[in-house]
Amino acid sequence: MSHFAKVARVPGDPILGLLDAYRNDPRADKLDLGVGVYKDAQGLTPILRSVKLAEQRLVEQETTKSYVGGHGDALFAARLAELALGAASPLLLEQRADATQTPGGTGALRLAGDFIAHCLPGRGIWLSDPTWPIHETLFAAAGLKVSHYPYVSADNRLDVEAMLAGLERIPQGDVVLLHACCHNPTGFDLSHDDWRRVLDVVRRRELLPLIDFAYQGFGDGLEEDAWAVRLFAGELPEVLVTSSCSKNFGLYRDRVGALIVCAQNAEKLTDLRSQLAFLARNLWSTPPAHGAEVVAAILGDSELKGLWQEEVEGMRSRIASLRIGLVEALAPHGLAERFAHVGAQRGMFSYTGLSPQQVARLRDEHAVYLVSSGRANVAGLDARRLDRLAQAIAQVCAD
């Protein structure tokens, strides 16, 4: 008898599978625009100098490897909440908001999903179409009914009117996931006026906003990218925010994130945090300490924080210049207007508008690897190879 005889193989993650194919490709001029990590001009995902310095200090000063507790590192939680909500936020001053440390932004999303399923039974969750694919499977695994609202039109443009109409149809009291900035996978972000209109619908429909804040600093700046989060937290009595330190601190493998909860009052926040600690205990017990201590050290030291802010701005500006550079490289091929949206998008990703067939040709004929949806990781571009990439895109678009 085999207990596992009927256990079937499931398909691998398509993005990780793309990485495997890229690694096995022998062509010297191959280009990886699939996996969502920041790369510098040398094609490396660097450790930030601020992180290195913080780690050196921690090694010299740390005195224990004991557990950090269900809510994680308290200094990290407080400082990350300040980064997201603002140090002068009334929610923090009145103890109506706090953060629970999680293993990355993905852990924060799963904790939010379990919280909704456990504490708000019957509530569905609504995601943008398209969204990060893991949103779908993660919330389904938590037992939530997953539905979608429109976000991008058939001609690959942000469709705010369709989005608002979709939000109006969401059942009262359901949860709506919103991307704070640097929308993944499209790169299309809402304007301030758009956000105010979304807020109006969320408030009237009494929806619970869950704001995914994975890319703070990669859009228009650390403070600018927090605008929508702070708007919703300031205008609504209850908000959930998931935060990630993978991108803006470069702590991908250290798994550093948090679920920030904004409540009506301090007493209710205590109730909510007791539930989060209970749920976290059954997910990961306590989160890893090292990365959180690094972030807390950086945000708590003016010198390290200043260096980190410079490094984040350097990554942000490089991504923005690569976007503009690609559009300019496409101009001689008569494609600048067709791909003008690439320059206007924000963050690491771009919904290029390329079809799955064109993406396949880029991979097979030109060793350029994109996700089949046409999503490209702009942060994986090499400024020295923009002309080659533009020529490859022109060829697959011409036929």
UniProtKB/Swiss-Prot annotation:
The lineage of its organism: Bacteria, Pseudomonadati, Pseudomonadota, Gammaproteobacteria, Pseudomonadales. Its cofactor is pyridoxal 5'-phosphate. Belongs to the class-I pyridoxal-phosphate-dependent aminotransferase family. The keyword NAD does not apply. It holds the Pfam family Aminotran_1_2. Keywords: Amino-acid biosynthesis, Aminotransferase, Aromatic amino acid biosynthesis, Cytoplasm, Pyridoxal phosphate, Transferase. It comes from Pseudomonas aeruginosa (strain ATCC 15692 / DSM 22644 / CIP 104116 / JCM 14847 / LMG 12228 / 1C / PRS 101 / PAO1). One of its GO terms (molecular function) is L-tyrosine-2-oxoglutarate transaminase activity. Homodimer. GO terms for cellular component: cytosol. InterPro entries: Aminotransferase_I/II_large, Asp_trans, NHTrfase_class1_PyrdxlP-BS, PyrdxlP-dep_Trfase, PyrdxlP-dep_Trfase_major, PyrdxlP-dep_Trfase_small. It is found in: Cytoplasm. GO terms for biological process: L-phenylalanine biosynthetic process from chorismate via phenylpyruvate; tyrosine catabolic process. It comes from the Bacteria. Substrate binds at G36, Y67, W132, N184, R375. The modification N6-(pyridoxal phosphate)lysine is found at K247. It is an enzyme of class 2 (transferase). Its EC number is 2.6.1.57. This is Aromatic-amino-acid aminotransferase.
